[in-house]
Design a protein with these regions (language model features):
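Compositionally biased, intrinsically disordered low-complexity regions
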Residues: 11, 165-168
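Conserved mixed alpha/beta catalytic, RNA-binding, or beta-rich assembly cores of soluble enzyme
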Residues: 127, 167-171
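Glycine-rich, mobile lid/loop segments that gate access to catalytic sites or pores
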Residues: 1-161
Length: 171
């Protein structure tokens, strides 16, 4: 069964704004963009997830709300010759602890504050750590025009197989 957190990003009253679910079709190929022959977008995405796991496991004080489930996607703009020009979009969805409601604010206000905190931490903690792992020509692709989608469906408390096992009841 799909968690309500994911379903909220899919089911919409306006049919023109229906979400596509929590799915994506990805493909890969060998390339000389990176030393490990992975496409640069995939390599960056993997680095984001490895670094999130590193923070969660070994430097938990930086982002103490992190939980194990996460996914990422990076979109890169290329010129006509296949040379990367810039990173266009970074998507990071990370499971987190339940939001704590402070006295005097609603659950919705607490949720929004936590979403803002996660987005800020992704930009100020995660991104610089990942960027530092790459050579100068890749670091130059990071700029202030990157579009960030951090937990774009909102709350992501229920993760792993309990959150979304899909049609096959597996994750």
């Amino acid at each position: 069964e799909q968690s309500g957190d994911i379903n909220r990003g899919v089911e919409r009253e306006d049919p023109y704004n229906q979400g596509a679910g929590d799915q994506g079709m990805m493909f890969g190929y060998a390339t000389n963009e990176t030393e490990n022959y992975m496409p640069l977008a995939l390599d960056l995405s993997h680095s984001l997830l490895w670094e999130l796991a590193e923070i969660r496991k070994n430097e938990n004080d930086l982002m103490p709300y992190l939980r194990p489930d996460a996914k990422s996607q990076v979109t890169i703009e290329y010129d006509d010759n296949g040379k990367p020009l810039r990173i266009d979009t970074i998507v990071v969805s990370t499971q987190h602890d339940e939001f704590i409601t402070a006295k005097g604010i609603t659950q919705e206000e607490a949720d929004l504050a936590m979403q803002k905190k996660i987005a800020e931490d992704v930009k100020s903690i995660l991104i610089p750590r990942v960027k530092a792992q790459y050579p100068a020509h890749v670091q130059a692709l990071f700029n202030d025009d990157i579009i960030y989608h951090v937990n774009p469906t909102g709350k992501f408390v229920i993760g792993g197989p309990h959150g979304d096992t899909g049609l096959t009841d597996r994750k």
